[in-house]
Curated annotation (Swiss-Prot):
Keyword Chloroplast belongs to the record: yes
Biased composition range(s): Polar residues: 48-57
This protein's name: Large ribosomal subunit protein uL4c
Presence of keyword Ribonucleoprotein: yes
Gene source species: Phaeodactylum tricornutum (strain CCAP 1055/1)
Gene3D superfamilies: 3.40.1370.10
GN (gene name): rpl4
Length: 215
């Protein structure tokens, strides 16, 4: 059973001053703990990151081994049917790795519910900065750090910056900051939200979240 929760945020400008309007976010969350959905989405995410392409050859796939090495009886040696037996050097591998598909299907509504649950749990650590994407004109780390200082954002902690468009200016301005992860709103995922201590959203990004994840 889901219930609706409303969160209201007052956005800041690039100088850290509050603007005279609000953004409201309507979230659907479970009455009971939604941690199991977050866990399922994490398993799905980790599975999609794996290649799982390692492969070894069995005795039937190794080249050679068609001829019986020696006759069955009379030699005093142990019987052998192929020199590509797993017991022999150069033989096949028993129960070796094979390419496999690792995936967990998760319904769209389940994934949306997991993301909304995490956003609600992190509601006190979310900050909205107006026009961050268009306001930064120079690709300088110093300029981005000053904006964070004015908005009282601690760059010693993990910061998730969610934008609609990963512009070259923002990429260059944040790439030298080890604790800042720049993420497009269309790629929002549970792992990035979980790792972040602070989440910065632009106004365009929060509108994208409303349309894509909170319908």
């Amino acid at each position: 059973m889901t219930i609706q929760k409303f969160i209201t945020y007052t956005p800041l400008d690039l100088n850290g001053k509050q603007l005279n309007f609000n953004h409201e976010l309507k979230l659907n969350i479970l009455e009971t703990s939604g941690n199991y959905l977050v866990h399922k989405d994490l398993i799905r995410h980790f599975g999609s990151q794996r290649q799982a392409t390692s492969s070894s050859k069995t005795r039937s796939e190794v080249r050679g081994g068609g001829r019986k090495p020696w006759r069955q009886k009379g030699t005093g040696k142990a019987r052998a049917g192929s020199n590509r037996s797993p017991l022999w050097k150069g033989g096949g591998v028993i129960f070796g790795p094979k390419p496999k598909k690792i995936s967990l299907k998760l319904n769209k509504k389940e994934r949306q519910l997991a993301l909304q649950t995490l956003i609600y749990n992190k509601k006190n650590n979310i900050l909205i900065i107006e026009n961050l994407e268009t306001g930064m004109t120079e690709p300088k780390t110093k300029a981005f750090v000053k904006i964070c200082q004015d908005c009282q954002i601690n760059l010693e902690q993990k910061v998730l910056l969610v934008v609609t468009d990963k512009t070259s200016v923002l990429k260059l301005a944040t790439q030298n900051l080890k604790n800042v992860e720049l993420l497009a709103a269309s790629s929002l995922n549970t792992l990035s939200i979980l790792k972040a201590r602070q989440i910065i959203l632009t106004s365009a990004a929060i509108n994208h979240i409303k349309e894509s994840y909170c319908d």
